[in-house]
């Protein structure tokens, strides 16, 4: 073990015993208690292997050549309060006199002695003594006044910053074990306590040699409550808790001091809850006493107070290895994290523990500081770890002090909010986070400006307070930055982010891909997928599918952007995009009349007649077939508003491979659909199969059918049923693929606007399936036949609701069609100003329109009948707007008169009615219609 130069014999001190008599008591008027030979210099001190030193031996100066022994005794007898006052006077002297050459002799010797003991690690073969304090040409800087205040003296700061964290390997000093013990001392621990366990049987004198322990032992330093810790700690301990191991522990042995690795004792200090919150250091509190101090002094000096972070040793080791092996840290100004020692440090060459690659989020030397966004792989870590860059080289003087990187939020500063997905920020590649694994950054030091501190704190709270996306499970995150990139490009936001800025910067895929609930991918058919999946039968239509980036630039169809101006049906000059396809006016009118008139055209030939400008009127059957094959649908004109979907093909959609991979439950059904005019489609699409699996269970109203019906009892039972169905709608919508990708406010708005439509639509489906539309099947325990309807006070309302199951009976709606129509009902009303995530909403709605087309194609054999079917079903959805408006009006009137009518309204239902129904009835919402009235 590296040998240590002893400072001189001291009074014995036993670990756990009372404090040393030399500490904590004023000794100005009495001689020294123990022998302290003044003639003995540091060059002739005996060598020992290790000594159990506490901080009571760190506050006394080393003798210097040419210094009077009386001065030594005077310094030796200074109390801690006198030492602190000396520091303050030195600061005031420095601030008043500008940049002097050196501090007063007494203070200089004291500071040098303390720093020689505190901050001087040693290598394996370094045993030469340190030069005396009086021979040191440049004074050490610990408390701030010694920092240069004028720009010409700025390079001297660079020489100061590096030794503060880790001295160079050529500097002689104490043994690595003792130096590490000095650095590890946490705040609040009394300097009179023993930090190293003495070997049993060995004397506790500072001059006695101690044999190194064969195995490193972990010592838990418990901080006890009491004033003695606070008073005896001295100014050296007034700050934040120190980081475990200091700079010496960052080299490869992660969190284990070199002394412990060589057989010493590793300190594992316990965190005290009293000191978990960030506190202002003594240097910052005394800032007004030194008006001449530069702001760099205040900013940099708090960087020795690194709080204790109980991280995993393997994590620290792997993090250190990555910092040491990264090429970006070997060149330039050498900006290193607090975990990375200087290149000259002997600990930098030690072998780290290989655990795997971790994201490298340290900012480059020539870039602005970026937020630390890599996630923590353990539980919530209360203390904040501040990583301050160690600046080397001439470029450090030209750069302003950087703020800290925070690897964990402090619970005392930030409350525990559920992590959420904030919207992406354009200037910096963005957490939804969603989730609890996301780490937000905020300043943890009082040296950071108040404006940036408050902004970061507000940003952290906003990011946590927003709605969280579905939990993604313990997925391993991708690398934080691309190879060769020096900046952290990981998006902060937990939401699916496909921003162009992150892609242009070369960032890796986002930590959280665009997923819906239960890990389902986000719905949406990209133009490239559509082009690849189109069958070879329709090559002319490939030119009309524009990429998303081009489509998002223009909100509507641009006639000039299309490659040609001919009708896709007959080849005549096109007049515009009609019903989703570029056609002429003649084919537009023909298609509208053919679909709305419900004509059954028959071809006299073999269904392969030529349709051109001259012969387009010869065979209406082939002309209509060609219109449907081109993708014309009566609701196609509404798709002009959608940015992502430009061409909707009614029957080609079933010919495309599924871009949405449904995991697990639908793998057997995720087959590619092919379509030909004479082939039937029998397989159920995976998404429709998923909609079947998330259908809510049967809900009961709790109505007592043994008692005679009264108006108040029926309405109260219906309200109780409505409350339960509203909760069911919320649960169902969360499981709906694509719905959780919307903003949380948009999700709430859509549910509040459409809950009545969903309830009455479900009522119609149950009445159609269970009683063939002859009665109103509200619930298994609440079925109203026509007689009970007449006896109720809302008979006219029952007749209005009865129209829906009768339409189901007339159209013979299938379950697949009902499920797709139900989702479209959820998406059929939006605010007048639009939604926050309008693009995702339009993409989701367009996807479910295509699913409805697929559901229609499961039963309809011809293209003509399929298009007619689509028109009939979408017309039913449009008619529901007027029907539901009557229900809204009756519900609001009943709610207003609920006390007079003795009708009870549940709490959640009351909130929705009071907040949204007046807005809906006042026309402050925008219904989305498939057809013009």
Curated annotation (Swiss-Prot):
Gene3D superfamilies: Erythroid Transcription Factor GATA-1, subunit A, Retinoid X Receptor. Residues 1-164 are annotated as: AF3. Residues 1-256, 331-378, 415-452 are annotated as: Disordered. Residues 567-639 bind DNA. Residues 165-305 are annotated as: Mediates transcriptional transrepression. One of its GO terms (molecular function) is steroid binding. The lineage of its organism: Eukaryota, Metazoa, Chordata, Craniata, Vertebrata. Composed of three domains: a modulating N-terminal domain, a DNA-binding domain and a C-terminal ligand-binding domain. Residues 1-566 are annotated as: Modulating, Pro-Rich. Progesterone binds at residue 766. A motif (LXXL motif 1) lies at residues 55-59. One of its GO terms (biological process) is negative regulation of gene expression. This is Progesterone receptor. Residues 418-433 have a biased composition (Pro residues). Pfam families: Hormone_recep, Prog_receptor, zf-C4. Residues 220-231 have a biased composition (Acidic residues). The modification Phosphoserine is found at residues 20, 81, 130, 162, 190, 213, 294, 345, 400, 676. Keywords: Cytoplasm, DNA-binding, Isopeptide bond, Lipid-binding, Lipoprotein, Metal-binding, Nucleus, Palmitate, Phosphoprotein, Receptor, Steroid-binding, Transcription, Transcription regulation, Ubl conjugation, Zinc, Zinc-finger. It comes from Gorilla gorilla gorilla.
């Amino acid at each position: 073990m590296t040998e240590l130069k002893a400072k001189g014999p001291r009074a014995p001190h036993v670990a756990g015993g009372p404090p040393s008599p030399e500490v904590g008591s004023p000794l100005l008027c009495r001689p020294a208690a123990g022998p302290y030979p003044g003639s003995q210099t540091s060059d002739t001190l005996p060598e020992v292997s290790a000594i159990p030193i506490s901080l009571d031996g760190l506050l006394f100066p080393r003798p210097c050549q040419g210094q009077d022994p009386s001065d030594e005794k005077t310094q030796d007898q200074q109390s801690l309060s006198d030492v602190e006052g000396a520091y303050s006077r030195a600061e005031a002297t420095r601030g008043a006199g500008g940049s002097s050459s050196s501090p007063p002799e007494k203070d200089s010797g004291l500071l040098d002695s303390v720093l020689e003991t505190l901050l001087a690690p040693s290598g394996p073969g370094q045993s030469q003594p340190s030069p005396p304090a009086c021979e040191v040409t440049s004074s050490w800087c610990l408390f701030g006044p010694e920092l240069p205040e004028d720009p010409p003296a700025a390079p001297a700061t660079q020489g100061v910053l590096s030794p503060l964290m880790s001295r160079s390997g050529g500097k002689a000093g104490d043994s690595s074990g003792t130096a590490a013990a000095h650095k590890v001392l946490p705040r609040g621990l009394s300097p009179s306590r023993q930090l190293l366990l003495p070997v049993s049987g060995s004397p506790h004198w500072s001059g006695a040699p101690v044999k190194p322990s064969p195995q490193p032992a972990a010592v838990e330093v418990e901080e006890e409550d009491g004033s003695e810790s606070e008073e005896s700690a001295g100014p050296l301990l007034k700050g934040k808790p120190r980081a475990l191991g200091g700079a010496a522990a960052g080299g490869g042995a992660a969190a284990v001091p070199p002394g412990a690795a060589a057989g010493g004792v590793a300190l594992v200090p316990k965190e005290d809850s009293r000191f978990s919150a960030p506190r202002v250091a003594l240097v910052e509190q005394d800032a007004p006493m030194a008006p001449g101090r530069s702001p760099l002094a205040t900013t940099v000096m708090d960087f020795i107070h690194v709080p204790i972070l109980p991280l995993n040793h393997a994590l620290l080791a792997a993090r250190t290895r990555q910092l040491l092996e990264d090429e970006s840290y070997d060149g330039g100004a050498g900006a290193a994290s607090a975990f990375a020692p200087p290149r000259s440090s002997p600990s930098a060459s030690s072998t780290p523990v290989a655990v795997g690659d971790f994201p490298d989020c340290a900012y480059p030397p020539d870039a602005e500081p970026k937020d630390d966004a890599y996630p923590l792989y353990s539980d919530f870590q209360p203390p904040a770890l501040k990583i301050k860059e160690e600046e080397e080289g001439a470029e450090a003087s030209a750069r302003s002090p950087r703020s800290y990187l925070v690897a964990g939020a402090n619970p005392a500063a930030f409350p525990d909010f559920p992590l959420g997905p904030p919207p992406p920020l354009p200037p910096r590649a963005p957490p939804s986070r969603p989730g609890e694994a996301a780490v937000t950054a905020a300043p943890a030091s009082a040296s950071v400006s108040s404006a940036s501190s408050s902004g970061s704190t507000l940003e952290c709270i906003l990011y946590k307070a927003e709605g969280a996306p579905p939990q993604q499970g313990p997925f391993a995150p991708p690398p934080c930055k691309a190879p060769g990139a020096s900046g952290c490009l990981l998006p902060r936001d937990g939401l699916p982010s496909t921003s162009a800025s992150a892609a242009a910067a070369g960032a890796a895929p986002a930590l959280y891909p665009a997923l819906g609930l239960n890990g389902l991918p986000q719905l949406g058919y990209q133009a490239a997928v559509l082009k690849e999946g189109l069958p070879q039968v329709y090559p002319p239509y490939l030119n009309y599918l524009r990429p998303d980036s081009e489509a998002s630039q223009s909100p509507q169809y641009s006639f000039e952007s299309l490659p040609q101006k001919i009708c896709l049906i007959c080849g005549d000059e096109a007049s515009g995009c009609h019903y989703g396809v570029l056609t002429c006016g003649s084919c537009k009118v023909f298609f509208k009349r053919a679909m709305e008139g419900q004509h059954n055209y028959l071809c006299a030939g073999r269904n392969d007649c030529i349709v051109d400008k001259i012969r387009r009127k010869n065979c209406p059957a082939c002309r209509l077939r060609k219109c449907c094959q081109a993708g014309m649908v009566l609701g196609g004109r509404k798709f002009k508003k959608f940015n992502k979907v430009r061409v909707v093909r009614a029957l080609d959609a079933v010919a495309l491979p599924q871009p949405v991979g449904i995991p697990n439950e639908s793998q057997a059904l995720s087959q590619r659909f092919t379509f030909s005019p004479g082939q039937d489609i029998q397989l159920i699409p995976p998404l429709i199969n998923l909609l079947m699996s998330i259908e809510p269970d049967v809900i009961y109203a709790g109505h007592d059918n043994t008692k005679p019906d009264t108006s108040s009892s029926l309405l109260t039972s219906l309200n109780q049923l409505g409350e339960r169905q509203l909760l069911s709608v919320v649960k169902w919508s969360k499981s709906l693929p694509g719905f959780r990708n919307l903003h949380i406010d948009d999700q709430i708005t859509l549910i509040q606007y459409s809950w009545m439509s969903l309830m009455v639509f479900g009522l119609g489906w149950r009445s159609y399936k269970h009683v063939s539309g002859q009665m109103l099947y509200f619930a298994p325990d609440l079925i109203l036949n026509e007689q009970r309807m007449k006896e109720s006070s809302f008979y006219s309302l029952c007749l209005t609701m009865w129209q829906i199951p009768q339409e189901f009976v007339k159209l013979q709606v299938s379950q697949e069609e009902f499920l797709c129509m139900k989702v479209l009902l959820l998406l059929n009303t939006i605010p007048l100003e639009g939604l926050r995530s309008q693009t995702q909403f339009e993409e989701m709605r367009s996807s479910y329109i295509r699913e409805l087309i697929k559901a229609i194609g499961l039963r309809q054999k011809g293209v003509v009948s399929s298009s007619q079917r689509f028109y009939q079903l979408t017309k039913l959805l449009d008619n529901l707007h007027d029907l539901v408006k009557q229900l809204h009006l009756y519900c609001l009137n009943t709610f207003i008169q609920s006390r007079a009518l003795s009708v009870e309204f549940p709490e959640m239902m009351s909130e929705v009615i009071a907040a949204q129904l007046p807005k809906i009835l006042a026309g402050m919402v925008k219904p989305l219609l498939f057809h013009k009235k």
